Regions:
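Extracellular-facing segments of soluble proteins and assemblies that are Gly/Ser/Thr-biased and enriched
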Residues: 1-35
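Surface-exposed beta-strand edges and flanking loops
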Residues: 7, 20, 44, 64, ...
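Polar low-complexity intrinsically disordered regions enriched in Ser/Thr and small residues
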Residues: 7-10, 25, 58, 111-115
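Short, isolated positions in well-ordered beta-strands
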Residues: 37-42
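Beta-sandwich interaction modules
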Residues: 46-94
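Long, compositionally biased interface segments
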Residues: 73-121
Length: 121
């Protein structure tokens, strides 16, 4: 399962995750980035003929994960820290935003819910 930030860029086409809960490993480990009191591991992989926001396509997938579950309220995700790291170390730049959401994703027969308020600082 996954709770965190999910989004896409175009030019280049990149699908990205910042996992605040759940493990999103897989792909090649690139480096780590410190943000909001956590050390996130950055993994990237290349997806071939996979579903995307423009239909079936080839694209990069970036995943930052720290593997623990935050508790309480007012958790912060400073996206600029992740984007700067991806831009510097991803090898493709970062592209133009298409969309970005706070997401809960469940698989393997699991389900879940979240009560959240999203705000911009």
């Amino acid at each position: 399962n996954f709770v965190g930030i999910y989004g896409w860029t175009t030019n280049p086409l990149i699908e990205y995750y910042v996992a605040e809960m759940g493990s999103m490993t897989g792909g090649t480990y690139v480096n780590s980035v410190d943000s909001d009191g956590h050390s996130y591991s950055f993994y990237k992989s290349y997806r071939y003929n996979a579903p995307s926001i423009i239909g079936t396509a080839n694209f990069w997938q970036y995943k930052d994960t720290w593997g623990s579950a935050p508790t309480g309220s007012n958790q912060t995700v400073t996206m600029s820290n992740h984007i700067n790291n991806w831009s510097n170390w991803g090898g493709q730049g970062f592209g133009s935003y298409n969309y970005q959401i706070l997401a809960l994703e469940a698989w393997g027969g699991r389900s879940g819910s979240i009560n959240a308020t999203v705000w911009q600082q």
